[in-house]
Amino acid sequence: PAVGPDRWGDIGLVPTGLTVDRYVEAIEVREVNDIPADVESSTVGGRYIFHHMTFSSGALSEDGTEIEGPSTRWPIHEVGRNADLFPEKAGRLLRANSALHLRASHVHSNGRETTGHLEFGFKFYPLGYEPEYRRGGALLGNGVDIDVKPNLADQEFHSYSVLSEHTKI
């Protein structure tokens, strides 16, 4: 609706149609909507309905209802974000028979009836490309127990992990 609460949540799975594994060199996500170009807005967010969204990809189950096995996490989509380029020696894998899992989305009301969707653009490395480095990451901290006090400057949160092998950061 033109005026209503923001929507937060999972959008679901979108099959990619890929028939072979491909490594991604760059990705861009952009919103396409029916907001007229001549409509004024006091913020860039007023021109869009998707504020941000996290997403991942992985091979679809046989019945196409879920992602099975390892998944690839992609950079968050957010208003004003440019394309993400991955280092030459560290492309990310988009698997054959995969789907994008559109997760934590935040869609907001902009005061007018608006229809919109997201388009995903992938630039692939040539067939046969194998990355020299693999992407890794450790989940640090505990988001449940973070206590941010209102109206208090200079708050800090520390979280540490020991690397188990030589790592390029």
For each predicted feature, which ranges?
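Beta-strand-centric surfaces of beta-sandwich/beta-rich domains
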Residues: 1-168
